[in-house]
Regions:
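Conserved, single-site charged/polar hotspot
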Residues: 1-211
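Terminal signal-anchor or tail-anchor transmembrane helices
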Residues: 206-223
């Protein structure tokens, strides 16, 4: 069976069609996925999840031209869950990573993500109530053909560069890892963070400064 791989988008859509109607990609859909998947995560884990969620849906739309346009994007464990609303922290996570997707060799990856097992304070694995730890991959330090694909998708798919574990990402963030390092922890050292063009762009420098400040404020608040 041949794979259908669409043309790589240069620009992110402003809106996407979902089972909840038309939503702004950056201001509604991505924040609501972060809320639906891991509402109470550390800010850096939320930022990592926002990038993974954005990549996941845009890659799916790339290869299924009707998805998000005439075919509604679903919400559920078979795709990714989006909540009815989003907290301010989830909105910020989407805002500071606006337009950023994960790529390998110039193509968006699948960017699978699951809950995975909880992690204990000492860094050992805890319980796995969702039975999804089996899909999580640990690819820190790996590149190219050494990156472990996830069994959640076809292993031979060129975009299969592993799977993020949300609880592990939260633990990593609590240890001081930033969202870029968290993403490479699961998807490999050679994963590319690429910014798509957008009519809503506020500028890299301004957004970066706002992002650092916002994440720092939330992080300080969470530690109190």
């Amino acid at each position: 069976m041949s794979m259908v791989l669409g043309a790589e988008p240069a620009q992110a859509p402003e809106r996407v069609l979902t089972t909840a109607g038309w939503l702004s990609l950056e201001h509604e859909y991505v924040p609501r996925v972060v809320a639906g998947e891991h509402l109470h995560a550390h800010p850096e884990a939320k930022a990592a999840l926002a990038i993974a969620a954005r990549t996941f849906v845009l890659r799916a739309m790339r290869d299924r031209p009707t998805l998000g346009r005439t075919t509604p994007i679903p919400s559920g464990e078979g795709f990714q869950v989006f909540a009815r609303g989003a907290s301010e922290e989830c909105v910020i996570a989407a805002s500071v990573t606006q337009g950023i997707v994960l790529r390998y060799q110039g193509r968006m990856i699948l960017a699978n993500h699951v809950a995975g097992a909880y992690w204990k304070p000492d860094g050992s694995l805890g319980s796995d109530p969702t039975n999804t730890e089996r899909w999580v991959t640990y690819n820190l330090g790996r590149r190219g053909g050494d990156v472990i694909p996830t069994g959640l998708s076809l292993r031979s798919h060129p975009g299969n560069r592993g799977c993020l574990g949300q609880h592990c990402a939260n633990w990593l963030a609590a240890q001081g890892y930033d969202h870029r390092t968290i993403l490479r922890f699961f998807y490999g050292d050679d994963v590319e963070l690429h910014e798509l063009a957008s009519r809503e762009r506020t500028g890299l420098v301004g957004r970066a400064l706002w992002g650092v400040l916002a994440l720092a404020i939330i992080g300080i608040t969470m530690r109190r």
